[in-house]
Regions:
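Substrate-binding/specificity loop regions of serine endopeptidase catalytic domains
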Residues: 27
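Anion-binding and metal-coordination hotspots
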Residues: 1-21, 30-560
């Protein structure tokens, strides 16, 4: 090999890029986009589907401001992976991505995302038995023209980001029982969960039945059944939700449970036997609401008790301080007779005792003299004596039994379901399905990672909406990366060793991407090579993902 050959050898960090592109291929993102949007393959240099695919990979791989993408991919040596495709990095510029987003906005993006989600579901031979749905808010900065007639409006609303100072839009999504996305929808920033949840469930039932997915159980938080009207909307639909406290029967049933019911001990629901895992007990019954029978599962858990103890202690401390202030104010008032003082004391003590605090009271008598003339009184000066009565209260500790009852009530909640088959879905399984709601909350955490959008992507609300659907595709790819690795670990009885030496069977998508971050690839004479000394940790992660090392030596197959 001469010196010129050595100079033509280039080593670069391929990172997770080939893996992410392959995941997009499995999802058929480019094909689905190209099939749904209007574009002319003979005129377009790069298909809109491939541009959307590149955008997904960019967002997942790059945790930096999302603009000047062309420069970014040039630094990543993407031209080596695109070689022989007829596409250059220069064609992957911000304007091209903006045009692709504009094309995306012309189609039913909710349907597009659902199609892609089902592609992944079928590729992994998975089913839909239950769906968990929820929303999250995405805060944005900038000025936007608002058309009140639009279905999608960037505006102020209840912020789940704790940023009420910023305008926002919302993302509603649903995941199946394994926590994998099956639908996503962009919502106006002020869209209420109470409106969206029942609406979305009705729409999803129709859509998925059309795809031959039947008898799905829909699981949502208490916003799903916030009113009698919400329950009417869900008639004929299998659902599980938490009955909110605004239904008076909830407090009545909790009170009944406090008095004593035949609890069924469930124990832990966690897959692991980790110390401190939440333990549950349940009590089942059937009652009618608005003339329709439902199953109810009363649930008590020690985990909520631990969470609520500090909250309640703060509440009780503040409550006692307020009572002591009121007692002090009353203690400064002068009463003309004992009866008046006792009457005032009785009213206050009734209030204190209703809040379950111990209280003691005593009346003090104070005699004051009023002399007939001003100045220092003499021994012979006449005076008039006035007797006043003051009532003093001492606020004691709160009654132990009352504290215990409050903790019980706060640690107990009521599940409602229209699934009446107790044999197939006993109470513990209804609870387990509801607790699976955390899977979508975990999925949303990945969307909360900072992704900064450049000016071209925020130029108009329609483009922001299209970008929001790209975020849902990012969530899809991230979820399946986790699923593939975790399933492989579970099936093989293996585990991932974390940097701190701990074993894990549930590595996060961030961990997976971090392991692949240092993959080095050699480019020489038009070919790609993976060095022989590639870290075994990287090779093992590829194995868990279901890919061979060859994924790094193949060029990207561009979809036109």
């Amino acid at each position: 090999m001469d010196i010129n050959d050595v100079k033509s050898i280039i080593a670069y960090n391929a990172s997770s890029i080939p893996v992410l592109f392959e995941m997009c291929r499995i999802a058929k993102i480019a094909e689905t986009v190209n099939d749904m949007v209007e574009w002319k393959s003979d005129n377009a240099k790069v298909s809109p589907g491939f541009l959307i695919e590149v955008l997904v990979v960019t967002i997942m791989h790059r945790r930096q401001p999302l603009w000047k993408i062309e420069e970014y991919w040039r630094k990543q040596k993407l031209e080596f992976m695109l070689e022989d495709s007829g596409i250059t990095v220069e064609q992957l510029n911000d304007d091209a991505f903006a045009r692709a987003l504009d094309k995306l906005q012309t189609v039913n993006m909710k349907e597009l995302v659902s199609r892609i989600c089902l592609n992944m579901l079928k590729a992994h031979n998975l089913t839909i038995e239950s769906l968990h749905l929820d929303t999250t808010s995405i805060s944005v900065e900038g000025l936007y023209e608002v058309d009140e007639e639009d279905d999608f409006i960037i505006c102020y609303g209840y912020s789940k980001d704790n940023r009420p100072d910023l305008k926002q839009f919302k993302i509603g999504a649903a995941v199946q029982q394994s926590g994998l996305p099956v639908m996503g929808q962009l919502l106006s920033g002020n869209k209420s969960d109470r409106e969206w949840n029942p609406e979305a469930i009705k729409e999803m039932k129709v859509f998925f039945e059309g795809q031959q997915y039947r008898d799905i159980i829909f699981v949502g938080d208490s916003a799903t059944v916030s009113s009698y009207e919400s329950l009417r909307q869900l008639e004929g639909i299998r659902f599980i939700s938490r009955l909110p406290e605004n239904f008076s029967c909830v407090s009545e049933w909790k009170e009944k449970a406090w008095q004593g019911v035949n609890w069924e001990e469930v124990g832990t629901l966690s897959e692991s036997s980790r110390k401190g895992a939440a333990e549950y007990r349940i009590y089942e019954f059937v009652e009618a609401i608005d003339g329709k029978p439902y199953r109810f599962v009363l649930v008590h858990t020690n985990s909520l008790r631990e969470q609520k103890t500090k909250t309640l202690q703060k509440r009780w401390e503040k409550e006692k301080q307020e009572l002591e202030k009121e007692a002090k104010r009353i203690g400064k008032r002068a009463f003309a007779c004992v009866e008046d003082a006792m009457r005032e004391s009785a009213a206050f003590m009734e209030k204190v005792e209703s809040l379950h605090y111990n209280v003691e009271a005593h009346i003090e008598e104070k005699v004051s003299r009023k002399y007939s003339r001003r100045g220092r009184p003499g021994t012979e000066d006449s005076y008039e004596e006035t007797v006043s009565y003051y009532v003093k209260h001492t606020i004691g500790e709160r009654d132990d039994m009352a504290c215990e009852k409050d903790l019980f009530m706060e640690s107990t909640f009521v599940l409602i379901t229209s699934v009446m088959d107790r044999d197939r879905y006993p109470g513990w399984r209804i609870l387990a399905e509801y607790k699976g709601q955390s899977s979508i909350e975990q999925a949303f955490k990945f969307l909360k990672s900072p992704v900064y959008l450049g000016p071209v992507y925020l130029k108009k609300p329609e483009r922001v909406e299209a970008m929001g659907y790209v975020f849902i595709l990012v969530l899809l790819i991230a979820s399946y990366l986790e699923y593939r690795v975790r399933k492989a670990l579970r099936d093989r009885g293996e585990y991932y060793i974390q940097p701190n030496g701990q074993k894990s069977t549930r590595p996060s998508v961030r961990t997976i991407l971090e392991v692949l971050e240092t993959v080095l690839v050699i480019y020489f004479n038009g070919n790609l090579y993976l060095p022989n000394d590639t870290s075994p940790k990287i090779l093992k992660m590829l194995e868990w993902l279901g890919f061979s090392p060859d994924i790094y030596t193949k060029k990207i197959n561009v979809i036109f």
